[in-house]
């Protein structure tokens, strides 16, 4: 992945720039200082953070070339690096300079990772064995989500996988269902639309096989799209 020059830097999307919640959570100067801690991630994900990271990393094999769109708080990148081993490579992109700088500090000294400014909608075609998209889709508007999914599907080689770990509609009996619906309406305005979004429907060309597993009473999903050889 080539270095991003100042002239090539992607603009910060309007949905990020205009949202007070997103500006505070991701774009603030001190956002990582307050939020980039394992206990914070576990609290936000109701104790399921490490489990979901392991489930995503389980889809990656040693020596593979992996793209991670969005920097992600917590130890997710380390899970992927552990899965690919010394012979693999991890590319990470994010549209926010502060997030890029923070992850570079966290992973300083790792030789097989590149972290650059970039938009998940603009990635190279068929360049990766795996794309691992961890809790990004619920944070973007539906039109942007469709564009991101299309780009990420296009980024894997024949036989490659795109792994989406994100929110899912919880079972009707889930005690946290009403609370999460309220949180998504008030703090994460694009998340609710993901509850009823079958990601396989975004595979317009039908070039992928799909499987979905849900966890924690259906609140979370891992959906894996595999490009046909």
What is each PLM-predicted segment?
Residues 130-143:
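A short SAM/SAH-binding and catalytic strip from SAM-dependent methyltransferases
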Residues 43-62, 75, 79:
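Conserved alpha-helix/loop element of class I SAM-dependent methyltransferases that forms part
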Residues 121-131:
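A short acidic, Gly/Pro-enriched loop at the edge of an enzyme's catalytic core
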Residues 163-206, 210-220:
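C-terminal alpha-helical "lid/dimerization" subdomain adjacent to the S-adenosyl-L-methionine
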Residues 67-121:
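Class I SAM-dependent methyltransferase SAM/SAH-binding core
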Residues 1-36:
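N-terminal, positively charged/glycine-rich alpha-helical extensions of SAM-dependent methyltransferases
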Residues 61, 85, 140-141, 156-158:
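Helix-to-beta-strand junctions that scaffold the AdoMet/dcAdoMet cofactor pocket
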